[in-house]
Amino acid sequence: MEMTSKERILAAMNLQRPDRVPLMCQFSIGCMMEQLHPDPVAFWYDQQTFADGLIELRERFRFDGILVSLHGHSDDWKRDLLSREELGEGSVRLEYPDRTELHCWQDLPVVTFRSPR
């Protein structure tokens, strides 16, 4: 009988024999963005957007699980936001009083501070 992903992982972790070897993956942020094409700012800061993306990739590639890299999640990221500029497909510039952030599908955000930290 075929196991569910959860049963398969639990069996392997308990040193029991699963129906097959559990398959897991850890995507880079750039790879996830290129696959999903989300709003790059929401993907970086919004927990639900990030979680939905992980679930979609797990289902798309039929993995038993995904190893999660936690990153910029912040509930108050909009608090000091001065402006948001769309620079092209999948590319956004955020302006804050102390810094500029460039978000894109290809890589992690690039942050430039206005004064030395």
Protein language model annotation of sequence segments:
Residues 1-117:
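Catalytic cores of TIM-barrel enzymes
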